[in-house]
């Protein structure tokens, strides 16, 4: 009669298996017990409440230049200060609006950049 293995002993046995052997074991386990090893994904609630919660949890923001306004030269200067772009690249970015100026930055950095751009006369979105 086989002895019952503890969780620790089972884990030690799994550690000794190669990756291929472990994958074969998982497949056999799934077939034997009619289960899958895929992680369960929780369904997100729909509606405006979910959108508000997602906005609160967001930690990376994009600063989108939507228009240069009347003071295009000032906006180009601010874009150059915020990014490491050269004069031509910054001008192309401003001329090609709407375009992202900064991507995946912290909320504080995004707000500060948006204020700088708005101060220069640009219209900006933070997403």
From Swiss-Prot:
Disulphide bond pairs: none
Organism domain of life: Bacteria
Alphabetical list of InterPro entries matching this protein: Ribosomal_bL12, Ribosomal_bL12_C, Ribosomal_bL12_C/ClpS-like, Ribosomal_bL12_oligo, Ribosomal_bL12_oligo_N_sf
Keywords: Ribonucleoprotein, Ribosomal protein
Cited SUPFAM superfamilies: ClpS-like, Ribosomal protein L7/12, oligomerisation (N-terminal) domain
A Gene Ontology cellular-component term: cytosolic large ribosomal subunit
GO molecular function, one term: mRNA binding
Keyword Ribosomal protein set for record: yes
Pfam families the UniProt entry points to: Ribosomal_L12, Ribosomal_L12_N
GO terms (BP aspect): translation
PANTHER family, alphabetized: 39S RIBOSOMAL PROTEIN L12, LARGE RIBOSOMAL SUBUNIT PROTEIN BL12M
Similarity section: Belongs to the bacterial ribosomal protein bL12 family.
NCBIfam families in the record: L12 (TIGR00855)
Cited function: Forms part of the ribosomal stalk which helps the ribosome interact with GTP-bound translation factors. Is thus essential for accurate translation.
Subunit relationships: Homodimer. Part of the ribosomal stalk of the 50S ribosomal subunit. Forms a multimeric L10(L12)X complex, where L10 forms an elongated spine to which 2 to 4 L12 dimers bind in a sequential fashion. Binds GTP-bound translation factors.
Entries under HAMAP family matching the protein: Ribosomal_bL12
Record's protein name: Large ribosomal subunit protein bL12
Organism listed in the record: Streptomyces avermitilis (strain ATCC 31267 / DSM 46492 / JCM 5070 / NBRC 14893 / NCIMB 12804 / NRRL 8165 / MA-4680)
Gene (name only): rplL
């Amino acid at each position: 009669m086989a002895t019952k293995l503890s969780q620790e002993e089972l884990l030690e046995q799994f550690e000794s298996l190669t990756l291929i052997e472990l994958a074969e074991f998982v497949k056999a386990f799934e077939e034997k017990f009619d289960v899958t090893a895929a992680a369960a994904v929780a369904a997100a609630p729909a509606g405006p409440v979910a959108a508000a919660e997602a906005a609160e949890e967001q930690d990376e923001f994009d600063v989108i230049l939507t228009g240069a306004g009347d003071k295009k030269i000032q906006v180009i200067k601010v874009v150059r200060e915020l990014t490491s772009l050269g004069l031509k690249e910054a001008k192309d970015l401003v001329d090609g609006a709407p375009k992202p100026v900064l991507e995946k930055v912290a909320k504080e950095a995004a707000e500060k950049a948006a204020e700088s751009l708005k101060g220069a006369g640009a219209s900006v979105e933070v997403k």
